[in-house]
């Protein structure tokens, strides 16, 4: 009987992903990767997702202060095997060392876009109109209860 596939990660996948994220962050923070593109950039690891068999780790990174973020992610992918070797010391308890894949994290950009949208005059006007309507409804309910 085949196992049911779940869309959400298991507790073990989440735990291992967090351990990998910490080890990866420490490696990047120490500046062990010798690449001018990576050395001059602060790389933030926001999330790591593990494959169900724990053999592939997809790290979502945000290169801070880099003009060409895609080039930084490409450089990280180029040095993925080196990173794998450096991280292996911190992850000795794992049976297999995961293969690293780096992807650009766009969640910060999405947050900024949504925040700008919510602060736009059109949305602010609509929100103020909803607040006024809610206050009127409360005042009407208070009158009815007297």
Swiss-Prot record:
InterPro entries: KH_dom-like_a/b, RbfA, RbfA_dom_sf, Ribosome-bd_factorA_CS. One of its GO terms (biological process) is maturation of SSU-rRNA. Its main location: cytoplasm. Residues 125-146 are annotated as: Disordered. Belongs to the RbfA family. Monomer. Binds 30S ribosomal subunits, but not 50S ribosomal subunits or 70S ribosomes. This is Ribosome-binding factor A. It comes from Mesorhizobium japonicum (strain LMG 29417 / CECT 9101 / MAFF 303099) (Mesorhizobium loti (strain MAFF 303099)). The lineage of its organism: Bacteria, Pseudomonadati, Pseudomonadota, Alphaproteobacteria, Hyphomicrobiales.
């Amino acid at each position: 009987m085949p196992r049911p596939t779940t869309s959400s990660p298991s507790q073990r996948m989440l735990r291992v992903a967090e351990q990998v994220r910490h080890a990866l962050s420490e490696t990047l923070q120490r500046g062990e990767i010798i690449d001018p593109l990576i050395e001059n950039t602060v790389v933030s690891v926001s999330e790591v997702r593990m494959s169900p068999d724990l053999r592939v780790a997809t790290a979502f990174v945000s290169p801070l202060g880099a003009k060409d973020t895609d080039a930084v992610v490409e450089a990280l992918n180029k040095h993925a095997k080196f990173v794998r070797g450096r991280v292996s010391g911190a992850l000795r308890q794992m049976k297999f060392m995961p293969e690293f894949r780096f992807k650009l994290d766009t969640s910060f950009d999405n947050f900024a876009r949504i925040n700008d949208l919510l602060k736009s005059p059109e949305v602010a006007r609509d929100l103020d109109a909803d607040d006024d309507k809610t206050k009127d409804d409360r005042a009407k309910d208070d009158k009815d209860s007297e």
